[in-house]
Amino acid sequence: MAPPGRRERPFSSGRFPGLLLATLVLQLSSFSDACEAPPTFEAMELIGKPKPYYKVGERVDYKCKKGYFYVPPLATHSICDRNHTWLPVSDEGCYREMCPHIRDPLNGEAILANGSYEFGSELHFICNEGYYLIGKDILYCELKDTVAVWSGKPPLCEKILCTPPPKIKNGKHTFSEVEVFEYLDAVTYSCDPAPGPDPFSLIGESMIYCGNNSTWSHAAPECKVVKCRFPVVENGKQISGFGKKFYYKATVMFECDKGYYLNGSDKIVCESNSTWDPPVPKCLKGPRPTYKPPVSNYPGYPKPDEGILDSLDDWVIALIVIVIVVAVAVICVALYRFLQGRKKKGKADGGPEYATYQTKSTPPAEQRG
């Protein structure tokens, strides 16, 4: 029994840290002898909730995710091995759900965007030339619950047809009795005889054809009288396109007499509004004026100040050459004078030595005496 006046405690403060340490050691030993969470896959998912660790020999099972189906015999489970790793397993046994095959439409073609009917794929439709698409040109393989289905019905390819082309005033077109025209069917327009002295001119395309979107290739032409005034150029003459009357697209050329120049175009055309385009030119007296824009406006031409700069460059080069020549001449003259001075100094120094030698010697006459 405890001494009187002292209460017993189930755990003393000194024993609690030791018990906590023992628990941690036990937990660490358990973790070190276990596998971590099992691997994850794109096409498979774990059956049940994952745990932070698994004991050696413990098994986990997988199933194919939504949109995938299982094809045996590949395993869909794994076991925690003694080396604390999971036995190899893969999701290669799970295949994407596939949409049903769709045939090419009549007079068209169905093209798989990625070459597969798996969900997530696209199926594109095109029609042959002369046919147009009715419906959606792209279908998507989607999941409906667990089944892969297409996003809509396949389209159809129908033949391109055109309604009869427009009728025109003072004219007609071929095949006027036909009520429906197929793709690339063509008609040709022509004008009726005119009641007056001047004929009708066909303004626009004479032949049109049934094209895409069930429309004609061009607007219907127009039949009307187009007549331009007789072109007169004073001090000039007509050199081509002669005639008494000038109708649609008539072309005339001019030249001026000697001593005159042409102001305008030498070639004019009679257009649909019965006027000449360009306007009839004029012949003006005198030589043709020359209009030379500033040379700075044309790339490749020197700027106005470039000539001055070039002449300045020539003067600078000439000045440099002159300075060099003068400097060389001065150096040569100075060197020449220096060498001449040395030569004269040498002669002056040699004279006294020769005289001294002569004075030291006894002249022959004195020796004989």
Swiss-Prot record:
Ranges of the Extracellular topological domain: 35-314
Domain of life: Eukaryota
Membrane topology: Single-pass type I membrane protein
Keyword presence, Manganese: no
UniProt keyword annotations, A-Z: Complement pathway, Cytoplasmic vesicle, Disulfide bond, Fertilization, Glycoprotein, Host-virus interaction, Immunity, Innate immunity, Membrane, Repeat, Signal, Sushi, Transmembrane, Transmembrane helix
Residue intervals on the Cytoplasmic side: 336-369
Expressed in which tissues: Present at the membrane of erythrocytes and lymphocytes (at protein level).
Disulphide bridges, residue numbers: C99-C141, C127-C157, C162-C210, C191-C223, C228-C270, C256-C283
Signal peptide residue numbers: 1-34
Ranges annotated as spanning the membrane: 315-335
Ranges of Polar residues composition bias in the record: 356-369
Glycosylation sites: N114, T163, T290
Domain Sushi: 35-96, 97-159, 160-225, 226-285
GO annotation (BP), single: single fertilization
SUPFAM superfamilies from the UniProt entry: Complement control module/SCR domain
Ranges for region Disordered: 344-369
PROSITE patterns in alphabetical order: SUSHI (PS50923)
A cellular component term, taken from the record's GO annotations: inner acrosomal membrane
InterPro entries tied to this protein: CD46 (IPR017341), SEZ6_CSMD_C4BPB_Regulators (IPR051277), Sushi/SCR/CCP_sf (IPR035976), Sushi_SCR_CCP_dom (IPR000436)
Compartments reported by the entry: Cytoplasmic vesicle, Secretory vesicle, Acrosome inner membrane
Quaternary structure, from the entry: Interacts with C3b. Interacts with C4b. Interacts with moesin/MSN.
Purpose of the protein: Acts as a cofactor for complement factor I, a serine protease which protects autologous cells against complement-mediated injury by cleaving C3b and C4b deposited on host tissue. May be involved in the fusion of the spermatozoa with the oocyte during fertilization. Also acts as a costimulatory factor for T-cells which induces the differentiation of CD4+ into T-regulatory 1 cells. T-regulatory 1 cells suppress immune responses by secreting interleukin-10, and therefore are thought to prevent autoimmunity.
Entry remark concerning the domains of this protein: Sushi domains 1 and 2 are required for interaction with Measles virus H protein. Sushi domains 3 and 4 are the most important for interaction with C3b and C4b.
Name of the protein this chain belongs to: Membrane cofactor protein
Organism of this sequence: Chlorocebus aethiops
